[in-house]
From Swiss-Prot:
The gene is ligA. This is DNA ligase. The active site is at K116. NAD(+) binds at D33, A34, Q35, Y36, D37, S82, L83, E114, R137, E174, K300, K324. It comes from the Bacteria. The keyword Cytoplasm does not apply.
Length: 841
């Protein structure tokens, strides 16, 4: 073998080891992941070609090797002892006092402090600077040999740095799984349908105990060193770090770092109990932002001679203490599983728990995230579960203790109705989240419904901001969006006065200016009636504002010199103005899931009438271009809810007027065929070709309903398709849907004008894109005028784009249009074209 090959292999090992050191120990990588992979592959190829190059400390050994049948038990040369625990400040102060009294020192005691890593304790043995063995802590006396798995951890050095390396060195530390590595591993496992890791600690322990080290090599493990065991320097064996190497624990950690071991950057040296407790506080506050899990901090007397003097008791050192954080995981029992409805309608399952202390608080509820998560965990009422809480994160059910499950438990099923409003709970195919379909009426969604309803692109109620919407809803003054049209100036002024008052007394002082004496006395009596002690001897109820509004207020005679009323008058005027609207805006304002402005515009253009749209079976919506099954079903779910229909009735009763009602577009005529309906019903196995075949043979839904599969087969329909259709029609809900859709299709055809009656615009059917800044009009105004001429205004350029309107500072869209040969219009040409066709500014 050539000397150059040997030198190249040596150089590759050196560079890879240095890269590992800079990445894991210094957090300062100097090469990219791709460059690292290239070096690693080159070394592997050399060692495969020349097996005699392979050494025990080669980085290539980290990929794992042969499968073991079992782990060998190994007795520790020096026992791996446990630490005494402290859970409060008194125990920490007692710990310091005991050392102080025993040492008899007049100087402040110094301690080396570090996080208590939540992983698996390990002992690493090096001989002549090379890694030879890794052993788990086990029971402290005997552990298991996991050397092959340890070799796969890139942050564990296989060969030590420096010239003063002991002949034998045992290093104690913690193998852990970083949080981001844990998350990524579980994402990949979920995608492959594999079992998820319960938490990073279990992930680290399970990874090290894999009999196949190739599996360990795929796990994102890392390592921190925090102590030493047996050391041999020259011919002398030491059971602790010798004075010649270090005289303090912190100096020993610095030496370990110099030899190439990763040591936490959070290690510090502090003085006395105040220093210990301040460190505990700092680490506790930083805990949730750390890249790894910890469950406390560890205090060690820094002076090694002092450690020797303090000694041990009951297999624990007197000179060290673990100050534990309150547990972030505990087990408890699921007493019920209920549904919470969020402001956007998302239905989140929540476990009601037997109360348990987790991370310093009593937890009685924990999120289960969604129905899929419940199915993955198989959480059932009565189960014993592991509850996790980290910092301010909402407590969650992390795992089920399956072997403690009581008999006769049942799998949980998502309810079919919203627990708040009774509307149907639905989930679109492929979505994780179930939603309440009572968008307009569900109290849980009320604020979001109002915010959307009054927004600029919906009903455009100018001056009604988010904070005042909260006041309106929280006060109970408005129960549904139609209640906006019942508001008065008096109500708005009273609401603001109450909502901004710091106390009932402050409200009374301000209200006095606007009330006659009799009305003022009535207001005082009302406050007393809702539990407010005007003498100030009892605590004011937190809900006094809402309670007062519900109880009713006397008539105010507003002193306009003392209060501004113009804002309220303007808001009422804006509400009145919004009564006159378009069908497009009204549909968008309803807040139907998946129905944005463009879909609302298409529905308005193609159907033209609210009464028609709100009673249309969902498959017929699919005849509108760009409306697919998901949007169509969402429309159907919305209009199927009695509460939503009642909310629309209330809006119309409050004189909300749609001014652009028109007959359905004649373009629908060619779409309203039985073949299309059969396709749009989404019947399994009924393809467009089969739908056309069935429509030709039978002519109506009624002809298909009662014959079963035989007539279909006789008409040439394949047996499997015939059986699928017949089975589908046997479901009452499907049968009703098909019949209603057929009836509505016929009614639509009857009310539709002939094709020649429809007016078309000069841009009918053309797609236009606008980019850059226009000087004479806004992008929205340009879009509206182009759409009025029949154009579809899109957000991206494609081969189907008819032309691009390019304003100032046009960017990548202009470049793409030019590359595709799309016609380019400047603003002057656009304005001229709009003027020619009656769309002047």
């Amino acid at each position: 073998m050539e000397q150059g090959v040997i030198e190249r292999a040596r150089e590759l090992r050196r560079r890879i080891e240095n890269a590992d050191h800079r990445y894991y120990d210094l957090a300062d990588p100097e090469i990219t992941d791709a460059q690292y992979d290239q070096l690693f592959r080159e070394l592997q190829e050399l060692e495969q070609k020349y097996p005699e190059l392979v050494t025990a400390d080669s980085p290539s050994m980290r990929v794992g090797g042969a499968v073991r049948k079992s782990f060998v038990k190994v007795r520790h040369s020096i026992p791996m002892l446990s630490l005494a625990n402290a859970f409060d400040e008194v125990e920490v102060k007692n710990f310091v006092d005991r050392i102080f009294r025993r040492m008899g020192s007049s100087n402040p005691l110094e301690f080396s402090v570090e996080p208590k890593f939540d992983g698996l304790a390990i002992s690493l043995r090096y001989e002549l600077g090379k890694f030879v063995q890794g052993v788990t802590r086990g029971d402290g006396d005997v552990g298991e040999d996991v050397s092959e798995n340890i070799r796969t951890i890139r942050s564990v050095p296989l060969k030590l740095k420096g010239n003063n390396v002991p002949a034998i060195l045992e290093v104690r530390g913690e193998v852990y799984m970083p949080r981001d590595g844990f998350s990524e591993f579980n994402k990949r496992a979920m995608a492959r349908g594999e079992k998820l890791l319960a938490n990073p600690r279990n992930g680290a322990a399970g990874s090290l105990r894999q009999l196949d080290s190739r599996i360990s090599a795929q796990r994102p493990l890392s390592f921190f060193a925090y102590g030493v065991g047996l050391i041999q320097v020259e011919q002398d064996l030491f059971e602790e770090i010798p004075q010649s190497i270090a005289s303090t624990h912190s100096a020993m950690l610095a030496q370990l770092r110099a030899w190439g071991f990763p040591v936490s950057s959070l290690v510090e040296v502090v003085q006395g109990s105040d220093g210990l407790l301040a460190y505990y506080q700092r680490i506790g506050e930083a805990r949730d932002g750390l890249p790894f899990d910890i469950d406390g901090v560890v205090y060690k007397l820094d002076d090694l001679a002092g450690q020797r003097e303090m000694g041990f008791v009951s297999r624990a050192p007197r000179w060290a203490l673990a100050h534990k954080f309150p547990a972030q995981e505990q087990s408890t029992t699921v007493e019920a599983i209920e549904i919470q409805i969020g402001r956007t309608g998302a239905a989140t399952p929540v476990a009601r728990l037997k109360p348990v202390h987790v991370a310093g608080v009593i937890v009685t509820n924990a999120t289960l995230h969604n129905a899929d998560q419940i199915a993955r965990l198989d959480v059932r009422v009565g189960d014993t579960v592991i509850v996790r809480r980290a910092g301010d994160v909402i407590p969650e059910v992390a795992a089920v203790v399956a072997d403690q499950r009581p008999p006769a438990t049942q799998s949980w099923q998502m309810p079919t109705q919203c627990p708040v409003c009774g509307s149907e709970i639905v989930r679109e195919e492929g979505q994780a989240v179930w939603r309440c379909s009572g968008e307009l009426t569900c109290p849980a969604q009320r604020k979001e419904a109002f915010r959307h309803f009054v927004s600029r692109r919906a009903m455009d109620v100018d001056g009604l901001g988010e904070k005042f919407i909260e006041v309106l809803v929280d006060s109970g003054v408005v129960q549904g969006v139609a209640d906006l049209y019942l508001l008065t100036v008096d109500q708005l002024l009273q609401l603001r006065m109450i909502s901004t008052a710091e106390s009932p007394h402050a409200f009374l002082r301000e209200a006095r200016e606007h009330l006659a004496s009799g009305a003022y006395a009535q207001l005082e009596a009302t406050l007393v009636g809702i539990g407010v002690d005007l003498a100030g001897e009892r605590e004011v109820p937190q809900t006094w504002q809402a309670d007062l509004l519900r109880a009713g207020l006397p008539t105010f005679d507003w002193n306009r010199k003392k209060i501004a009323t113009k804002w309220a008058e303007n808001l009422i005027e804006a509400i009145e103005t919004s009564r006159d609207t378009t069908l497009e805006r009204f549909l968008f304002a309803l807040g139907i899931e998946h129905v944005g402005e463009s879909t609302a515009k298409a529905l308005s253009a193609w159907f033209g009438d609210l009464d028609l749209i709100r009673h249309l079976p969902w498959p017929l919506f699919k005849r509108v271009p760009d409306i697919g099954g998901e949007v169509a079903r969402s429309l159907g779910h919305f209009f199927d809810q009695p509460g939503n229909q009642k909310a629309i009735d209330h809006l119309l009763a409050r004189k909300v007027r749609i001014g652009d009602t028109h007959p359905p577009s004649p373009k629908l005529r060619g779409e309203l065929r039985l073949a299309n309906l059969l396709e749009d019903l989404e019947i399994p196995k009924v393809t467009p070709i089969r739908a056309a075949q069935i429509a030709t043979a039978f002519g109506s839904i009624d002809a298909l309903r009662n014959g079963g599969p035989e007539p279909l087969v006789e008409a040439g329909v394949p047996q499997s398709v015939a059986e699928s259709l017949a089975t589908w029609l046997l479901v009452p809900a499907n049968d009703t849907l098909a019949v209603n859709a057929q009836k509505k299709l016929s009614a639509l055809l009857a009310m539709m004008p002939e094709a020649g009656e429809e007016k078309t615009g000069p841009l009918d059917g053309q797609t236009v894109v606008i980019t850059g800044t226009l000087a004479a009009l806004t992008r929205d105004a340009a879009k509206q005028r182009l759409e009025a001429l029949g154009a579809k205004v899109a957000g991206s350029v494609s081969k189907k784009t008819a032309f691009l309107v390019a304003g100032e500072e046009a960017g990548s869209k202009l470049d793409k249009a030019q590359s595709l040969g799309v016609e380019i219009w400047d603003e002057a040409r656009l304005l001229a074209f709009l003027g020619e066709h009656g769309q002047q500014r």
